[in-house]
Amino acid sequence: MKLNTNSNAYIIIYSAILVVIVAFLLAFVFQALKPMQDANVALDTKKQILYSLNIRGLDGAEAEAKYKEVVKTKAEDDGHILYGCVVNGEHITVATLKGMGLWGGISGYLAIKEDGTVYGAYFNHESETAGLGAEIKDSQAWQEKFIGKKIFDENDNVILSVVKKVEDPESQVDCVTGATLTSNGVDAMIKESLKGVRIYQVDCRFPTKSAEEE
């Protein structure tokens, strides 16, 4: 009996078989590439932590080596993820930041000196406007404005702020020009993410697992 390739039944069965084959191939490719994707994500995270420590311009292998050299511990307490680091003999704590910008999620890392001032900062975003809100990631000069700023008051409350008009240069940073709402998101992210961090601040002596045990 000759198969009728123009029949509805044939078309439906043929299409279903193609869908199954394509789905299988996509699943196979995804699984095959997943280890590489996970490794890339892990490397990007390490680079961002290094950026907050003012260590930039390293390729993949260099970044991996430098991360192992300076990042000594990782601690998770009360929702905080902290990294204990030693840079040029100085104990630095890197705090993880997460929040919302104007159009999507924003994140970052803030490096904190033992005296409670900023050692360095790095911010990232998912979908902020290029040339405006995206400057929180793209402008190293803006990130460097945080260096030296006071983060906590005498009661360990977060006073580091991103504002439209700086009145207290000791603890305030100018917002990104033309990106007030994104800057407000960074300010809220800092306040929320660092709440209570002073209590849990760690360094290389913190009794926790190695930063490589992730």
Which sequence ranges carry the predicted segments?
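Flexible, solvent-exposed loop/hinge segments and secondary-structure transition points
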Residues: 2-214
